[in-house]
Amino acid sequence: MDGFLPYITGDDSVGLYSEEFHDIYHSGYGALTEAYEKFVCPLIVEKDNINVLDICFGLGYNSKAFLNANKNKKIIFDCLDINKTLMCLSPFIKTNHRLCDYFRKQKDNDKYSKYVRKGKYKKYRIEDWVNIVLIKHLYEKFGEEFFMEDILSQNQFSPFFEQNLINFVKFLQKRGYKDIGSPQKWLFLHNIYYRYLSKRDILFNFYPDDARRTVQKLNKTYDYIFLDAFTTDKCPQLWSIDFIKHLYNLILPDGVLVTYTNSVIIRNTLIEAGFFVGKIINEDKKFVGTIASKDKIKIKNYLNEYELGLLKTKAGIPYRDFTLADSAEQILERRKSEVEQSNLMSSSRYIKLHSNKIKKRCSDNEL
């Protein structure tokens, strides 16, 4: 797994550390928990036929969690990620097992141990049939090369992969994959495949390319968009106003975009692109992300006056990528220059003024 280090997150699901970005792919409190809390639980799914655009598919947690939670729907997933390897490894990643021994050992790794927070263990799950569906569609897209046995068989990584699914693919290999499209022949291997999937249409389309190029080629609209790119300072390419405007054009009038970030830049970018924007609040009443839609009714937790004011400071100035082809460095430098030349109030000054207003209000109330 060149460039990636697997580790156990706080809910005992597997996350990845990127050596390129020196950052984690998944929240330290739980990769699977994050997928459910930020990309599944905020959505009220009423339609029976659904189209999902998953930007930065990675290990597939968001789409897998959504499918697992919506078993009786017909769903088409369009999955975008520049890294084909992660796509192909996605069905084999462990999500349902406690790996406490490995959690204790990884504390010695200073690259990612600081991110991991052992929190409340929640029984979110990904059932095996979801991964079997992924295996089927990955094979149909990439052929036999989707099965990266050189990585899956390495001893150092074996604790992070589902051995039963690896063995399942090896069995299919021996049969020349001739049974991979025949659910009735899989019945003796996995009853749940027949039970859940024989009467439904589930489709995964994979686009292993720069998401900026892919979104310009898509000619359909979506009910849900998952925006799960690296943070803005690491991957500004997928947070620019120009990219977000493309997403606005790809989403249905009643569609919903969800993302993990609470960033002032991104919330203002979404608003400038035409979205109504609100907050995602988890069951612990913590703000864990941002929700956006063309339909104001879809927003349950609006931004308050203070948060809206903060968007109008220098902190809210968007990233710009006019051709959707610039490097991260170019985009960051362009925004830096725009911020320096802007006459808008700085966020630090705005926060200070707001704090002083609160202090004055409290003082007046005491009189």
Give names to the regions the model predicted.
Residues 223-238:
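A short SAM/SAH-binding and catalytic strip from SAM-dependent methyltransferases
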Residues 267-291:
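Conserved Class I S-adenosyl-L-methionine
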Residues 237-253:
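A short glycine-rich, Lys/Arg-flanked "PGG" loop and its adjoining helix->strand segment in the class I
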Residues 2-7, 151, 290-367:
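SAM/dcSAM-binding transferase cores
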Residues 45-219, 226, 241, 283, ...:
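The AdoMet/dcAdoMet-binding core of the Class I SAM-like
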Residues 1-48, 61-69, 88-91:
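Class I SAM-dependent methyltransferase Rossmann-like catalytic core
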Residues 73-75, 250-255:
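A short helix->loop->beta-strand "cap" motif at the edges of active sites that frequently abuts
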Residues 224-226, 254-261:
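Conserved beta-strand signature within the Rossmann-like core of class I S-adenosyl-L-methionine
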